[in-house]
A protein has these predicted regions:
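Sec-dependent signal peptide recognition
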Residues: 2-8
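Flexible, glycine-rich phosphate/dinucleotide-binding loops
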Residues: 32, 68, 133
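Catalytic-site microenvironment of enzymes
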Residues: 5, 20-23, 55, 183, ...
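Serine-esterase "nucleophile elbow" of acetyl-processing enzymes
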Residues: 18-65, 75-84
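N-terminal signal peptide c-region/cleavage motif recognized by signal peptidases
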Residues: 14-16
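Alpha-helical cap/lid subdomain in secreted, periplasmic
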Residues: 73-201
Length: 201
């Protein structure tokens, strides 16, 4: 009887080990399927790709259109406590730049989000963004350099400019010139996938 009970405990622990792992996507409109149905967005497309190879991972999309790094920082604790993610895809900063907010404050916010995530044993995948040159070269350079600086400082994986293969192609952008359209979403999913796969256990 004891052996049977012991076997059941071991089996339950094994099942728990194989339990579903959550990947939280913390982003802005780029990740929130802005201007299209949710199922057409890159997060949904990436989830479908993962299901074919890594079925125990599910994506939880916590992205909000208009979100800033400060907004993400204000929400991260609740997300970590409720979702208990294994990985956080951090795609924030673009709205900080578009509003002319301090790149130093943005860096501080992203750093704190990353540290809090790492403190629970989760991994951060940082998605870098760029902004139009409206605020001048110095501001744009300060903004963009935040991402590689953080990646090096915190030893996290960095996805180069997410919209690199999309932003300059009008047929892949919405009319506002800022948001990728539905045709571009598969490109974004394909861009992220090779950086994400090595992080999956």
């Amino acid at each position: 009887m004891f052996r049977l009970f012991f076997f059941m405990i071991i089996s339950l622990l094994s099942l728990q080990t194989m339990a579903e792992q959550v990947i939280v996507v913390l982003g802005d409109s780029i990740s929130a399927s802005y201007g299209m149905p949710v199922e057409q967005g890159w997060v949904s497309l990436l989830q479908k790709k993962l299901l074919t190879q890594h079925s125990r991972y599910s994506l939880y999309n916590a992205s909000i259109s208009g979100e800033t790094s400060a907004g993400g920082l204000a929400r991260i604790d609740v997300l970590l406590n409720t979702q208990k993610p294994a990985i956080v895809l951090l795609q924030l900063g673009a709205n900080d730049g578009l509003r002319g907010l301090s790149p130093l404050d943005m860096k501080s916010n992203l750093e704190e989000i990353t540290r809090r995530t790492q403190n629970i044993g989760a991994t951060v995948l940082l998605l870098s963004m760029k902004i139009p040159p409206n605020y001048g070269k110095r501001y744009v350079d300060l903004f963009y350099n935040v991402y590689p600086q953080l990646a090096q400082q915190l030893k996290i994986t960095l996805v180069p400019f997410l919209l690199e293969d999309v932003a300059l192609h009008k047929d892949l952008m919405q009319a506002d010139g800022l948001h990728p359209n539905a045709k571009a979403q598969a490109i974004l999913a394909d861009k992220i996938e090779p950086y994400l796969l090595p992080l999956l256990q």
